[in-house]
Swiss-Prot record:
The gene is thiE. This is Thiamine-phosphate synthase. Its EC number is 2.5.1.3. 2-[(2R,5Z)-2-carboxy-4-methylthiazol-5(2H)-ylidene]ethyl phosphate binds at S132, L133, T134, G162. It comes from Pseudomonas syringae pv. syringae (strain B728a). Keywords: Magnesium, Metal-binding, Thiamine biosynthesis, Transferase.
Length: 205
């Protein structure tokens, strides 16, 4: 599957009070994948928000991905992103079917990406590459890892961790396919700035 572009990831705290307006502003600027990431245990709220996001994604022809919840993804007929401790990738693939997007966190280890590919992943994700507000304690990953992954694992590569418009070009130059961005996109002061940033990230790819 050809996946390339901006991979927008929601943050419930960052987007409190402006959730849908900021997401729509990003979609208006151009988003390849939108990941709904919410660690809250309120299942009814998560279903409601994910359903609202799916409606927006369908309008803007963007693919929705659910973080860490294959059952919710199956219920909505969308993709899922799994961390290393978020359940079985083969089980998620079996549940969602062969056409669904299933992404895998690989931190900074190429062998995890090789295993993810064998297990049926659609794309592999690496990071953090820069200082991250979302995961400040995550170990840093060197830029040259992207080329190593490209040589050994022939899947789209998502990169994450402190990505801004200033440092994103380095990642693209090293071979990244998907720029996974949270604060660098949604940390804007208004919806117009979110759209501007989304367009600028998309233009890099």
């Amino acid at each position: 599957m050809k996946l390339r572009g901006l991979y927008a990831i929601t943050d419930s705290q960052l987007l409190s009070g402006k959730f849908l307006s900021y997401v729509e502003a990003a979609l208006d600027g151009g988003v390849t994948l939108l990941q709904y990431r919410d660690k809250n245990s309120d299942e009814s709220r998560r279903l409601r928000e994910a359903t609202e996001l799916l409606k927006l994604c369908e309008r803007y022809k963007t693919r929705l991905i659910i973080n860490d919840d294959a059952e919710l993804a199956a219920r909505l007929g969308v993709g899922v992103h799994l961390g290393q401790s978020d359940g079985s990738l083969p089980d998620a693939r079996a549940l969602l079917g062969h056409k669904a997007i299933v992404g895998a966190t690989c931190h900074g280890r190429v062998e995890l990406a090789e295993q993810a590919k064998a297990d049926g992943a659609t794309y592999v994700a690496f990071g953090r590459f820069f200082n991250s507000l979302t995961k400040p304690g995550a170990p840093a990953v060197p830029l040259d890892l992207i080329a190593q992954v490209r040589a050994r694992v022939h899947l789209p590569i998502a990169v994450i961790g402190g990505i801004t418009l200033e440092n994103a070009p380095q990642l693209v130059e090293h071979g990244a396919d998907l720029l996974a961005v949270v604060h660098g996109l949604f940390g804007a002061e208004n919806t117009q700035e979110v759209t501007r940033r989304a367009k600028a990230f998309t233009a890099l790819l």
